[in-house]
Swiss-Prot record:
Pfam families, per database record: NADHdh (PF00146)
Similarity comment: family membership: Belongs to the complex I subunit 1 family.
Keywords on record: Cell inner membrane, Cell membrane, Membrane, NAD, Quinone, Translocase, Transmembrane, Transmembrane helix, Ubiquinone
Organism: Polaromonas sp. (strain JS666 / ATCC BAA-500)
Lineage: Bacteria, Pseudomonadati, Pseudomonadota, Betaproteobacteria, Burkholderiales
Catalytic activity entry: a quinone + NADH + 5 H(+)(in) = a quinol + NAD(+) + 4 H(+)(out)
Cystine connections: none
Quaternary organization: NDH-1 is composed of 14 different subunits. Subunits NuoA, H, J, K, L, M, N constitute the membrane sector of the complex.
UniProt main location, coarse: membrane
Protein name per the record: NADH-quinone oxidoreductase subunit H
GO BP term, example: aerobic respiration
Any one GO molecular-function label of the UniProt entry: NADH dehydrogenase activity
Enzyme class: translocase
Bilayer-spanning residue ranges: 16-36, 94-114, 129-149, 167-187, 208-228, 261-281, 296-316, 331-351
Length: 359
């Protein structure tokens, strides 16, 4: 279908514009078609978070703006758009502006290689997983720059905490991705999903038992918890601990500059969740080979699984207390990294035996 639309547009525009115009215009259309729904999901994730936490605390959550509070994200966006951006007198102005930009850009650029179906992706490159590992590691620079440029000891302390935490858990997440790379034998995101469509359980119609979450369960657990820490989500949110340093590296920001950090955090939540679905939960594949399930489009399965993973993020926030900073560092360096290294060796040895299930 996408190829049909592209061919139609090329034929329509070919006689009007030079041949190089339509590919550029088509790329812009695809970017808009990904970013606009993403921004909508980010906005309404804030509402779902407040509603879900309200449910766990036996209260309603936002219910005043629009029916059932459905217009609350729009009201929040308008509030942030109309607020003044105040720059501290002693701040480094260029870096102060650059910090939020460098934080949100990797969170958006990473979606370029995320497949929403077998043939639905902005760029279906063979090194998609490598691109993701590289681009997401750039976000830590925005955090450091924001803390340094604010010329505030509170912002600087928050930036040091955030950067140390992000770097620590990036290592464990990187090893998790390497294990998935080993069993899939590909860096292509689509190939990783399709590699989960084969196995003994598939022959019995139980597709979900052939996905990577089961044989790589320890890696899946480490990835999920590391994703919480990487995005500075509860219970790893010491960066913006309300009782300590308020908003961490964002403490001197206001208006849309603050909103860009906010958007980056929630866009990263969606990114970590959809990556968990693609790498471990079969992506757009149906969990059971049943004719009724097979009628459901793959992108709906992908969205439903991603929504469940994101909801698990919110459930963790509603139920667990915040860890101390030393506990977070100990968990990352003394538990997660050794576990992923050991499992990397175990899976490598497993693949060399006659019991290799990933052939």
């Amino acid at each position: 279908m996408i190829d049909t639309v592209y061919g139609f547009g090329q034929g329509l525009m070919g006689g009007i514009w030079p041949a190089t115009v339509w590919p550029v215009l088509w790329a812009l259309i695809k970017i808009v078609c990904v970013l606009l729904p993403l921004m909508g999901c980010v906005a309404y994730l804030t509402l779902w978070e407040r509603k879900a936490i309200g449910f766990t605390q036996i209260r309603f959550g936002p219910n005043r703006v629009g029916p059932f509070g459905l217009l609350q994200p729009i009201a929040d966006a308008l509030k942030l758009l109309t607020k003044e951006i105040i720059m501290p007198t002693a701040a480094s102005k260029g870096l102060f502006v650059l910090g939020p930009i460098m934080t949100i850009m990797p969170a958006l650029a990473a979606w370029a290689v995320i497949p929403f179906g077998p043939d639905i992706a902005l760029s279906n490159i063979n090194a998609g997983l490598l691109f993701l590992m590289a681009i997401t590691s750039m976000e830590v620079y925005g955090v450091i720059i924001a803390g340094w440029a604010s010329n505030s000891k509170y912002a600087f302390l928050g930036a040091m905490r955030a950067s140390a935490q992000m770097v620590s858990y990036e290592i464990a997440m990187g090893f998790c991705l390497v294990v998935v790379l080993m069993v899939s034998a590909s860096l292509n995101m689509t190939d990783i999903v399709m590699s989960q469509a084969k196995g003994i359980a598939v022959g019995y119609g139980l597709n979900f038992l052939s996905w990577n979450w089961l044989p790589l369960l320890p890696i899946f657990v480490v990835y999920f918890i590391s994703g919480l820490a990487e995005t500075n989500r509860h219970p790893f949110d010491v960066v913006e601990g309300e009782s300590e340093i308020v908003a961490g590296h964002m403490v001197e920001y206001s208006g849309m500059a603050f909103a860009m950090f906010f958007l980056a955090e929630y866009a990263n939540m969606w990114l970590v969740a959809i990556l968990a679905v693609i790498l471990f939960l079969g992506g757009w594949l149906s969990p059971v080979d049943w004719w009724l399930f097979n009628l459901i489009p793959g992108w709906i399965w992908l969205g439903a699984k991603t929504f469940v993973v994101v909801t698990m993020f919110l459930w963790v926030r509603a139920t667990f207390p915040r860890f101390r900073y030393d506990q977070i560092m100990r968990l990352g360096w003394k538990i997660f990294i050794p576990v992923t290294l050991v499992w990397l060796v175990v899976v490598g040895a497993w693949m060399q035996t006659p019991y290799n299930i990933w052939k």
